[in-house]
Amino acid sequence: SAPANAVSADDATAIALKYNQDATKSERVSAARPGLPPEEQHCANCQFMQADAAGATDEWKGCQLFPGKLINVNGWCASWTLKAG
């Protein structure tokens, strides 16, 4: 289950960025970002993910775009940017 500080579907930033904790249910095909094919875009390979955020687990990590909250590594949002390296 999601941690208490997980980004919720009704979060204003989540709505603005089209965030979905399940990338397969997101708008990543219609709103795809450059760098990888849409089906390969998810939070785990995004430069904004913060693996060492407080409360992070294997499935839930921090994100620079959602301070103090956790995102699902299998999620996607419209700010997805391929992590360097």
UniProtKB/Swiss-Prot annotation:
Any one of the GO BP annotations: aerobic electron transport chain
GO cellular component terms attached to this protein's record: periplasmic space
> Which one Pfam family would you cite for this protein?
HIPIP
What is the first-listed, main subcellular location in coarse terms? periplasm
| Highest taxon above the source species | Bacteria
Instruction: Show the disulfide pairing.
Output: none
Residues where [4Fe-4S] cluster binds: C43, C46, C63, C77
Alphabetized, the UniProt keywords read: 4Fe-4S, Electron transport, Iron, Iron-sulfur, Metal-binding, Periplasm, Transport
Subcellular locations according to the entry: Periplasm
InterPro entries listed in its UniProt record: High_potential_FeS_prot (IPR000170), HIPIP_sf (IPR036369)
Listed GO MF terms: 4 iron, 4 sulfur cluster binding; electron transfer activity; metal ion binding
Residues folding into a coiled coil are none
Subunit details? Homodimer.
The task this protein performs is described as: Specific class of high-redox-potential 4Fe-4S ferredoxins. Functions in anaerobic electron transport in most purple and in some other photosynthetic bacteria and in at least one genus (Paracoccus) of halophilic, denitrifying bacteria.
Q: Which family does it belong to?
A: Belongs to the high-potential iron-sulfur protein (HiPIP) family.
Its protein name is High-potential iron-sulfur protein
The organism encoding this protein is Allochromatium warmingii
Q: Show the taxonomic lineage.
A: Bacteria, Pseudomonadati, Pseudomonadota, Gammaproteobacteria, Chromatiales
